[in-house]
Amino acid sequence: LKANDEVLEIGTGSGFITACLAHMARAVTSIDIHTDFLETAKAKLNTLDLNNVRFEQADALTYQPQQQFDAVLVTGAVAVVPEAFKHWLRPGGRLFVIQGLSPVQEALCLTRNGDLFDVESLLETDVAYLTGAQPESKFTL
């Protein structure tokens, strides 16, 4: 991240990553579907005197931000990267997301290049899905 970046964090969680982002970027918008996570993170960040974070209660899968961002960080996995996440990026912006079917998921960095996206595979992992972003159940015998 660059010092003048505006960042969107999807999945506030405990606020730890939010605090890290706030130290590195100019402005951070952090969204979470769980109000209790947001309240806990706000309280923690207030003790650190970080004033460049805006918290919003929202479902990432239906979220409609009022702006685009230099970077978007998704802290939970998705079965498939929603197209909307990509369009929240400014030209040259980067999206960090974990995609795939547990137990084999892939951390990706997508960089917006006009209407196209360069995709870099970073590592394999296995993390919990964002609420509502888990794969559909399939019936098998």
Specify the residue positions occupied by each region the protein language model found.
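Conserved nucleotide-cofactor-binding alpha/beta core module
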Residues: 1-117
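Active-site capping/gating segments
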Residues: 100-141
